[in-house]
C-alpha cells in the first residue's frame, strides 16, 4: 500500500480542476486556454514525478496500490494501481492530451465547455488505465464516452451529428457486453461479489462460461480498437471531428481497446484466449490488408488517415494473438508508437485544413511551395507511419513479425501464410502514404487560399509537431527503454497463463 494517494490525485485532478473553468470569464478565451494548458502540463509533471520516484521498473506486480471502500451496498471499491502494462499508456495520455490542448488553440466557440470536455476525457482515460477493479474500469470506460460525444456533436463538421450518433450507438451498444462480462466475472462463484482484478485473475471458470465472458469483452474492445467489421464508426468520426479531438481519438481512445484486450481478455481469461488467438491473428492480418486497400481509395484526407489507423491496429491484434513475449511486447510498443504517429498525422491534416479549407485530394495540389514547414513535417511523419527504419513503427512491426514467427502455438505453414499477408499490407502502406503526399503537396496548385493571410506553420504548430516527432525517433533508435517498462509484466502474463 502507498501512504499518499498519488494515483487518486492523478485521476481526479483534471476533471476537478476543469470544473473551475466555468467560473472564468465567459469572453476570456485566452484565459480558458492558458488555464487548461497549465492544468494538463501540471498533470503531466505530476504523473512523471510519481512514476520516476515511486515506481520500480523491475517489479512486474501492481504498484502504487490504493484500495478504499466506496459503495458498500454494491461492493464497489476505489482500487487503483499501475504496472508495466499501464505505465506507457498513462504517460502517452498525458503527453497527447497536453499537445491536443495546444492544437485546440483556434477553437473559440463555447471555449469553456470544450476544454472542460477535454479534461473530463483526460480523467476517464487515466482512470481506465489505472483501474484495478472491474466495476471501476467500466465506470471510467463510460465516463470518457460522454465528452467524446459532445466534442463530436458540437465542434465537428457538417455531418457531425450523424457521426456522433453513430459513435455513441457503436460504443454504448458494445458497453452492454462489457457490463455483462464485468458483472458475470464479479458475481461468479462467490457469496460476496468481488471485482478485484487480482482475485479474478487467479480464478478458474467453466470452459463454456469463460468463452461467453471472453466474447462479451472482445465485442466491447473490438469496437473501441477497432477490429473489423466493427470499425465503420471510425472513418466517419475522424472525418467530422475537430483535429484536436482526432488527436485524442487516434492517440489514446483506440489504444484503450487494445489495452482492454491485454488486461482483461489475456490476463483474466487465458484459456479462452488460447482458443481465440488463431482467429485474432487471422482477423488482424486481414485487417492490415483490407484497411490499407480501403485507405488508398479514400478521397478525404482525414478518412485516409483513419483507415491507416485501422490497418496499423492490425499489428497490435496479431501481437496479442501470437501469445509470445516478443509478439506482446511488439503490440505494446505499437500502441505507444501509433499513438504518437496517428495523433501527429491528424494534427498536420487539421493545420492544412485551417489554411485552405479543403479536405478532398482532388481539390488539393502544389501545397509544398505554399507551406514548406508543414510539408516537411507531414513527409517525415508519413515516413514514420510507413515504418521507415529509424522510426518507432519499424521496430514495433518488426518485433510483432518476430513474435508470430517464433510462436509455438501455430504450425509452420499458417505462420508463413500470415507473415506473407502482413508483408502485403506493409507494401500497401507506402503506396497510400506516398500517394497522399503526392496528391497534397506536388503537382499544380489547384486551390486558391480563402484569405490573404495564408501562411506557413507558426511556432505553436511547429512545437506540437516536433514534440511528437522526437519520441517517434527516440523509440526508433532506442526502443529498449520503452520495452523495459513492460518486459517483466509481459513475461509474467505469457508464462503464468499459457505455459503453466
Swiss-Prot record:
Enzyme nomenclature, EC number: 7.1.1.-
Chief site of localization: plastid
Keywords in alphabetical order: Chloroplast, Membrane, NAD, NADP, Plastid, Plastoquinone, Quinone, Thylakoid, Translocase, Transmembrane, Transmembrane helix
Topological relation to the membrane, as annotated: Multi-pass membrane protein
Transmembrane segments annotated in the record for this chain: 4-24, 35-55, 87-107, 134-154, 167-187, 208-228, 242-262, 272-292, 305-325, 330-350, 364-384, 386-406, 416-436, 462-482
Any one Gene Ontology cellular component term annotated for this protein: chloroplast thylakoid membrane
Record gene name: ndhD
Enzyme class, spelled out: translocase
Gene Ontology terms for molecular function: NADH dehydrogenase (ubiquinone) activity; ubiquinone binding
Localisation per UniProt entry: Plastid, Chloroplast thylakoid membrane
Signal peptide: none
Coiled coil (UniProt feature): none
Protein name: NAD(P)H-quinone oxidoreductase chain 4, chloroplastic
Family affiliation: Belongs to the complex I subunit 4 family.
Catalyzed reactions: a plastoquinone + NADH + (n+1) H(+)(in) = a plastoquinol + NAD(+) + n H(+)(out); a plastoquinone + NADPH + (n+1) H(+)(in) = a plastoquinol + NADP(+) + n H(+)(out)
GO BP, one annotated term: electron transport coupled proton transport
Lineage: Eukaryota, Viridiplantae, Streptophyta, Embryophyta, Tracheophyta
